[in-house]
Amino acid sequence: MQSKLALIQELPDRIQKAVEVVLAMSYQEAPNNVRRDLDNLQACLNKAKQTVNRMVTSLLDKPSMAAYLEGKPLPEERPTLEERLRKLELSREPPPTRSDPAPAKL
């Protein structure tokens, strides 16, 4: 059984082969409305091929995705910039002072 990583890596090639099969189809003798639909199918397949290529490249560039697909432990997530700034602000704030008298109990 192929690994998840190998399956993902093969996607662009598999789609390329499917697109080539459709592009090789001869349909010049088909009626105009059929030819137009098949032209649209070819355009769709070409766009799908480009989209899959970009997505696979993007996914495999992410260390956590590559580690998951290879079955390795995931790298620790780094805190976002907002989380780091919030921690920094909290560490620099002076402790609250009680200048107001405590509310009276009824």
From Swiss-Prot:
GO terms for cellular component: host cell mitochondrion. GO terms for molecular function: RNA binding. Residues 1-73 are annotated as: RNA-binding. Its main location: host cell. Belongs to the nodaviridae B2 protein family. Homodimer. Interacts with RNA-directed RNA polymerase. The lineage of its organism: Viruses, Riboviria, Orthornavirae, Kitrinoviricota, Magsaviricetes. One of its GO terms (biological process) is symbiont-mediated suppression of host innate immune response. Residues 85-106 are annotated as: Disordered. It is found in: Host mitochondrion. Keywords: Host mitochondrion, Host-virus interaction, Inhibition of host innate immune response by virus, RNA-binding, Suppressor of RNA silencing, Viral immunoevasion. This is Protein B2.
